[in-house]
């Protein structure tokens, strides 16, 4: 929707060209109080409306994969994932193989669609494998632009998620509730699409992770997906030369910062948010489509990262999370 988002970075040919075999497919609806006509998405005013909206999102993924099984596939368990990766390996190693589908693991961004914590089990049965409790603040916890701790309901939500073996996503959670979650949650924790706050000069919102939180995430063997969005790399990018002044060096700096904090490459990956309401006009100048993420590899090599390091960052870290936390079958 160019009038809102700019020109898209995504398309099936670009997924294939960029060797993007697995993505987190996001369920998302906006709270009406924050919309103001800005976002071309469904909005809600109550938990019941949020539930309906998120369920419609999920149904859309099921229709997509049912109607186009050669192009998109839901990955619900380790058996699905293993079979899917084997197909991708065959394709990468033999160009004569037909292009495989893109695998989708469903992630709920903002838990307002969960009307009460006990309902998590129903969403799990429907195919949701990861939940980020916040987008903005809600009855479960503080979120972006709306700070606050975990509520009693939020703690119960985390307990229900842990019982099911779900992955907790702390992206968009407030600093306080994210750190609480890292202390309390008994399952796997990630930050699917967050950057290091310390590298974003003068950022006025609580959207990204402080180094203290990144250290906690590393201690919990979590993974943090770096977002190549200009405003999340330089808050004042429009004043500093616009898109043409933004380069992949900003992305590399974010990746390297997490690696330096960790002392290794096991805790950082890519979390593009390219389905998140922005287009090519808002990303570094070397990126025209998602396929251009491959340009990050030689830049990492130039900085001294070896082949194993780069494999961790591009695929193995996220795959470790999925292989360790998806149900067996």
List where the protein language model places each region.
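N-terminal hydrophobic targeting/anchoring segments and the immediately downstream early-domain regions
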Residues: 1-134, 138-152, 199, 206-329
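Loop-centered beta-sheet repeat module
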Residues: 147-184, 188-193
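Aromatic-anchored, glycine/proline-accented short structural segments
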Residues: 177-218
């Amino acid at each position: 929707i160019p009038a809102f988002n700019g020109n898209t970075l995504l398309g099936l040919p670009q997924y294939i060209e960029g060797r993007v075999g697995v993505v987190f497919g996001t369920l998302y609806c906006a709270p009406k109080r924050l919309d103001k006509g800005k976002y071309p998405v469904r909005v809600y005013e109550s938990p019941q409306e949020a539930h309906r909206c998120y369920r419609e999102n999920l149904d859309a993924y099921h229709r997509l994969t049912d109607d186009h099984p050669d192009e998109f596939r839901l990955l619900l368990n380790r058996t699905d994932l293993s079979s899917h990766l084997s197909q991708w390996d065959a394709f990468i190693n033999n160009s004569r193989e037909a292009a495989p589908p893109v695998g989708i693991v469903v992630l709920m961004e903002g838990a307002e669609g969960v009307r009460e914590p006990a309902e998590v089990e129903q969403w799990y049965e429907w195919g949701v494998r990861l939940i980020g409790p916040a987008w903005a603040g809600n009855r479960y916890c503080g979120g972006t632009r709306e700070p606050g701790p975990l509520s009693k309901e939020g703690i119960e939500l985390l307990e229900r998620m842990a019982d099911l073996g779900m992955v907790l996503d702390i992206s968009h959670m407030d600093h306080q509730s994210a750190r609480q979650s890292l202390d309390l949650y008994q399952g796997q924790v990630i930050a699917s699409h967050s950057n290091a706050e310390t590298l974003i000069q003068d950022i006025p919102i609580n959207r990204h992770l402080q180094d203290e939180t990144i250290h906690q995430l590393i201690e919990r063997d979590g993974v943090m997906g770096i977002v190549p969005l200009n405003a999340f790399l330089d808050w004042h990018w429009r004043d500093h030369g616009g898109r043409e002044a933004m380069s992949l060096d900003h992305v590399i700096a974010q990746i390297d910062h997490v690696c330096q904090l960790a002392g290794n490459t096991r805790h950082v990956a890519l979390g593009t948010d390219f389905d998140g309401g922005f287009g090519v006009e808002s990303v570094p100048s070397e990126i025209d489509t998602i396929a251009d993420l491959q340009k990050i590899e030689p830049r990492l090599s130039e900085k001294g990262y070896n082949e194993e390091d780069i494999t961790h960052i591009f695929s193995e870290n996220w795959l470790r999370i999925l292989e360790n936390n998806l149900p067996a079958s």
